[in-house]
Amino acid sequence: MRTISSLAILVAACVLAGCGSNGLAAKAMEATGLRKPPELPDAQKPPRSVALRLHASPKLNVDKRGQPIALAVRLYKLRQKDGFEQAPYAAFLNPQAERDSLGPDLLEVREIMLVPGQRYEVTEKLGREAGYLAVVALFQRPAEGRWRTAVPAADAERSGLTLGLHACAMTVGGSSEAATLSSVRCQ
C-alpha cells in the first residue's frame, strides 16, 4: 500500500514538474505519437464573420433641392485593394468598367439600397481568400474622397465595420455607433 502511495506521489510530482519545463510534456507526448495537429491552410478555414452596420442619416444622399433620397451601397469582397482605391467614381457607375478596374481582385459584389434613416445590420461572411471588405456609396453629389472605403478582412472580423451614410459622404467607425461626420462639401 505504501508503495502505491509513493508511486502516485512520484507520478504527480513528475506531471507537475513537466508543467513548468518548457514543453517537456509536449515533447514526451510527441514521442509517444501524440502531437498537436498542424494549422489548417487558409483555404480550409471557415469563412470570417463580420458584423456590418450601415446607418443612414435622415438627410441621406440629398439631391440638388436638398431632398433626401435612397442610396445604392455596393459591398465588395476583394483579394487586394489597389485597383479599388485607384478606380475613379465613374468606374463604379458602369458594371463593365467596375469589373475592368477591379480585375482579378474582385471576388464578389453585392448592392444594398438604403432609404433615409434606415439601419441595416447583418453578419457578412468573407471567404479566407478575401483580403479586404470594401464599400462604395453611390451618392448623387459625392464629397471628394468620402464615398469609398476598404478595410482589411482580419480587422473587420475583429471589430466589425460601422458606416455612417450622410448627405454626400460616408464616415467609418469600428464600434456600434457610427463615427461623427466632419465638415465636408457636397459637389
Show the residue positions of the predicted features.
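Short amphipathic, basic-aromatic surface patches that mediate peripheral association
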Residues: L52-K64
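Glycine-rich, aromatic-bearing surface loops/beta-hairpins
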Residues: K27, R148-Q187
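Bacterial N-terminal signal peptides that target proteins for export
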Residues: M1-A8
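A short, structured loop/turn motif at beta-sheet edges
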Residues: A43-P46, R79, K125-A130, D155-R158
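Bacterial signal peptide processing site
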Residues: G20-G23
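C-terminal motif of bacterial Sec signal peptides marking the signal peptidase cleavage site
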Residues: V15-G18
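Post-signal peptide N-terminal segment of mature Sec-exported envelope proteins
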Residues: A28-R53
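Mid-length scaffold segments of soluble, non-membrane domains
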Residues: P68, L75-R146
